């Protein structure tokens, strides 16, 4: 890890640089895979599964028998943990339901919104070094609460042609309708355009590597919506001298083990804490099964000391971390001054792992500084809000002249006329 002390503000941009995920140089490769899936459907997806995931599949769909077999393979303890997490995620997201109300902007002019679920959504769950069954819950539970009619899940199978049992169990618990064995670019293309087996969806959610990210970017240009721009995972710990270096080191390492391009940052007002955390990170790192991944990630990570808590907060808002852990004596007052972060974890007993799994908040969050403009996944991510307006005669008489004047000044005479003909009818005593 890189140790930095009292950086000048002019250095902040350089200090806060993240590992870059450049997807533009992948676009030609990704586009060729997408185009073939569009043209050949299942056959192309099956071929790419053999090429990229090294598995020959008879079909893409996961059968009911496979789901039942998977359920039998998941331990009762893990099932209970998944159900607990699902319950908490459900409770938190159900509380986000939108309740629209009618607003009278003028007498006779009434406006309102109605929340409507996105009918078909696609969830992408990566394979790789660890089964991300928690992400199934984070995406499928709010989709079901929102009322999405079709929830489609794609995930790469293992070399044995099977999906990890915990992923299948989480999908069942969360209410996923259909599951397919497809990963990478081909999975994104299948959900974006549809194949003989995989339904076309209207919005795609979920993390992935740089190829998945590039695929989502390309299909979102014109054909389907996506959740948000994605990048490597990241955490910042904002701490003072009261923080426990053991806890801080554990939190930094929990992020570092995600992947070699993850980033973990400490911003503190205490030199003593900076030094203690460095020692503790090295001690805990040696004990981790995923030590090699975490070790590479730590090369992107920094332990930064600043002069004051005000400066620490300003630097934090400039960084806009995906995950922010605040371990200070007055963490609630510090939290009030945070304006750029994906999800915030308050106090020494609130590890980022809680949000990753079971506190109830969503772990699908903006990375790469996008927390300055994007929110994490929530119930709103799975709905659209349609606006309605109703105008009665009294209302048209009030706002009609203003509309006519504004339309005339924008040289949109047909817009003006649409109001004028109605006002004329009202003057003649005929409002129909």
Q: Language-model segments: which ranges?
A:
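A glycine- and small/hydrophobic-rich beta-loop-beta segment
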Residues: 258, 266-341
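Flexible, glycine/charged-enriched surface loops at secondary-structure junctions
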Residues: 98-103, 225, 262-267, 287-297, ...
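Conserved small-residue-rich beta-alpha loop and adjacent elements
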Residues: 103-169
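Short acidic-hydrophobic, aromatic-tinged amphipathic segments that line or gate anion-handling sites
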Residues: 1-7, 178-183, 303-308
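Conserved NAD(P)+-binding/catalytic subdomain of aldehyde/semialdehyde dehydrogenases
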Residues: 175-263
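N-terminal Rossmann-like NAD(P)+-binding subdomain of aldehyde/semialdehyde dehydrogenases
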Residues: 1-119
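C-terminal core of ALDH-fold dehydrogenases
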Residues: 318-432
